[in-house]
Regions:
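Membrane-lumen/periplasm interface segments of specific transmembrane helices
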Residues: 172, 350-441, 468, 476, ...
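Signature aromatic-anchored transmembrane alpha helix within multi-pass, membrane-resident enzymes
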Residues: 89-102, 156-163, 271, 358-362, ...
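Perimembrane helix-loop-helix junctions
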Residues: 146-148, 336-363
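Transmembrane-helix motifs of polytopic, lipid-linked glycan transferases
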Residues: 69-80, 243-267, 306
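Membrane-interface transmembrane helices that cradle and orient dolichyl/undecaprenyl
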Residues: 296-299, 304-319, 345-348
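Start-transfer (signal-anchor) and selected internal transmembrane alpha helices
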Residues: 1-34, 68-169, 353-356
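Transmembrane-helix signature of polytopic, membrane-embedded enzymes
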Residues: 254-285, 301-302, 317-321
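Hydrophobic/aromatic-rich transmembrane helices and adjacent perimembrane loops
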Residues: 117-128, 257, 437-488
Length: 644
């Protein structure tokens, strides 16, 4: 029989470590993780690498033997280093082995494709890092005496991270802009909208409006009810440049860490809440908002997250203000606002929490689609409709085509996009709370729009931001349930909650690795022709009507009349006084469907009596319309293409 002290110590260990897990379950779990890691190693490093079948088997057996050896070694070292008994060390290592579930998230890429070895190594490193984190969390749960107080607070660390994050992402953003790495047309479009607004024309841009609409359209409000553009006006007034829009957008993105921290802090410790905020900023759909072409929709996350926070805190008036701010970003936020009303109904809240958001969303939808858009469209067909026209001309016809031809949606790109959207959340972690359902309309719209050639099913475009907010919210709001589950099992809730948050952090980093390719690095490279491109843009008079290559558009967007030289012949009123021709088609970053029109423009200019060459080099030719001459360029019907 043990002494009283020994009995108390044993009881303390059991209280710290949670209830005893039957040995059979531990064995099954470890065996499952072992088989998973073995399969992943085979798929990532052995299969499809040119090895013969016998050699593949030898390498696989060697890898499995190495895993067994490392497992035994880790168990021995842990037991001796931290003076743990067999039960404690086993419990810690079983818990820590869960980190390798991260490999399962990206196993399909390895089984169905052949990812770069660098990506596989980075994923392996991420899994090992997560294993170390889990080990630390579990060890401190077993031995609370090992806990220590960091010299700085979690809030200060998060603030420092956000400062570094903002300057790093903004440096990349500006480097990409100066390296002509952006396609450029969307950035130039919104820059011109702000310029024309300051000169008496509300959010007007002939660069798109004269191209996409057969009838006169004089405002961006014909396509989107995004009154948030007014937010950019004072900043643009201070510095009239495309870079201003990009920097302001990045500020709004990094500020999202604030409401995420507040939401997480409701159920987590300060340090775990800070990790959750960092994880959100590193999710690919959020991180790439800082780098991709500009869109006002990137501002939607901040008010949505604050709306979620005030919803959870039951602060009704601030909640309504946040909803209003979110709705001002774009008309399709009505799905999110209405969804939050339904979430309140699910939670059986009072009538005002349900009725007011739902009624507001319906009224805003009616105002946008029945009043605002018809007024500014002036009878023209909405450009947005081209994204879905392939499905049919009426809602009923579209629905029938979707039901009878599911292959229209179940394309490789759409399936890959859906997977990339959920990778950062382990594919399933968001399912623990119904908040994720609010993301469904947005994912569906993106998948449907992709079939119409609108490039909406891309995880790093602005379209993916709103669904990501609600997928992440599904994880955050489930943490309270995770804690309750742990308590019912007699375990420390902080341990399981930490496991979820840390898993999302490493899954977000790993997902970013898998969606980042060589193109993202090439966009930052300085090329030999960049200096001349800057000189060419500077040669164009500030008040002249100009047509330039798309990548050059942001540099010359501060003017009343702006055209894409790539599609100049497709404009309804092509009246450019200066036309810049890039002689290298590869720099145009365009598909072959535009090549014929561009070649036709070059031939017309070479034989034109109205346009004269004022600059010519191996890279560029600048044509100037003679004084008093009319452009008289022929018009060709524009291809159906969406701008955003």
């Amino acid at each position: 029989m043990g002494t009283a002290t020994e009995v108390q110590l044993e009881g303390s260990k059991q209280a710290q470590g949670g209830r005893q897990i039957p040995r059979i379950y531990k064995t099954r779990w470890v065996l499952g993780i072992f088989l998973l890691v073995s399969l992943w190693i085979f798929a990532a490093f052995i299969r499809g690498r040119g090895y013969s079948r016998p050699l593949q088997m030898v390498l696989l057996v060697a890898a499995m033997a190495l895993l067994i050896g490392l497992g035994w070694l880790a168990t021995t070292i842990v037991r001796r280093q931290f003076m743990l008994d067999r039960e404690e060390s086993t419990r810690i290592l079983v818990f820590s082995s869960s980190a390798f579930l991260l490999l399962a998230v990206f196993l399909p890429e390895c089984l169905l494709g052949k990812p770069f070895l660098a990506r596989s190594f980075l994923l392996l490193i991420s899994s090992l890092a997560l294993f170390a984190m889990y080990f630390s969390v579990s060890l401190r749960a077993e031995r609370p005496a090992l806990n220590f107080r960091p010299p700085v607070s979690a809030g200060k660390v998060l603030f420092l991270f956000c400062v570094v994050y903002f300057f790093a992402t903004s440096w990349i953003t500006l480097s990409k802009l100066h390296a002509f790495g952006y396609v450029g047309q969307d950035i130039a479009y919104f820059t011109q909208c702000l310029y024309t607004t300051l000169h008496g024309h509300l959010f007007y841009s002939n660069m798109y409006h004269d191209l996409l609409y057969g009838k006169p359209v004089t405002s961006d409000l014909a396509g989107h009810n995004q009154l948030v553009l007014f937010v950019f006006l004072p900043f643009y007034l201070l510095h009239k440049s495309a870079s201003t829009l990009l920097i302001v957008r990045n500020i709004f993105v990094v500020l999202c860490a604030w409401p995420v921290y507040l939401i997480a802090r409701r159920v987590l410790s300060p340090w775990l809440a800070a990790v959750a905020a960092i994880a959100f900023l590193l999710v690919p759909a959020v991180l790439y908002q800082n780098f991709y072409d500009f869109a006002p929709l990137s501002l939607a996350a901040l008010p949505l997250l604050f709306a979620l926070y005030f919803f959870l805190e039951r602060s009704f008036k601030p909640y309504l203000i946040a909803l209003l701010c979110a709705q001002l970003v774009r008309e399709d936020l009505v799905f999110a606002v209405f969804g939050l009303g339904l979430l309140a109904l699910w939670q059986r809240r009072s009538l005002r929490w349900v009725a007011i958001p739902c009624a507001f969303a319906l009224l805003w939808a009616f105002f946008s689609w029945k009043i605002l858009f018809p007024y500014f469209l002036q009878g023209a067909t909405p450009a947005v409709a081209s994204c879905f026209s392939y499905l049919g001309s009426t809602p009923g016809e579209m629905l029938r085509n979707i039901v009878h031809h599911p292959g229209l949606l179940l394309t490789h790109k759409n399936v890959l996009y859906t997977k990339q959207m959920v990778d950062s959340f382990g594919g399933v972690l968001f399912l623990m709370n119904p908040a994720w359902l609010i993301s469904v309309p947005y994912v569906a719209i993106n998948i449907l729009g992709e079939g119409g050639g609108c490039n909406t099913a891309m995880v790093y475009r602005h379209y993916s931001l709103i669904p990501t907010v609600f997928l992440f919210a599904g994880v955050l709001l489930a943490l309270e349930k995770v804690g309750s589950f742990a308590r019912r099992r007699g375990e420390r809730p902080e341990t399981l909650q930490a496991a979820v948050v840390l898993f999302v952090l490493m899954a977000a980093l790993s997902s970013t690795v898998f969606v980042t390719g060589q193109q993202q690095f090439d966009d930052l490279q300085t090329r030999s022709w960049h200096h001349e491109a800057i000189q060419v843009a500077a040669m164009l008079p500030a008040d002249a009507s100009v047509a330039v290559p798309r990548y050059m558009l942001p540099s010359v967007a501060n003017r009343e009349s702006l055209y894409q030289s790539l599609r100049l012949l497709e404009y309804h009123h092509p009246d450019a006084s200066y036309i810049v021709i890039d002689k290298d088609w590869q720099r145009m970053a365009a598909t072959e469907q535009w090549r014929e029109n561009y070649i036709g423009l070059r031939q017309l200019l070479e034989n034109s009596s109205q346009y004269k060459v004022i600059y010519n080099s191996a890279n560029y030719t600048i044509y100037k319309l003679c004084d008093g001459c009319a452009a008289n360029l022929p018009h060709r019907e524009p291809m159906k293409e969406m701008r955003d």
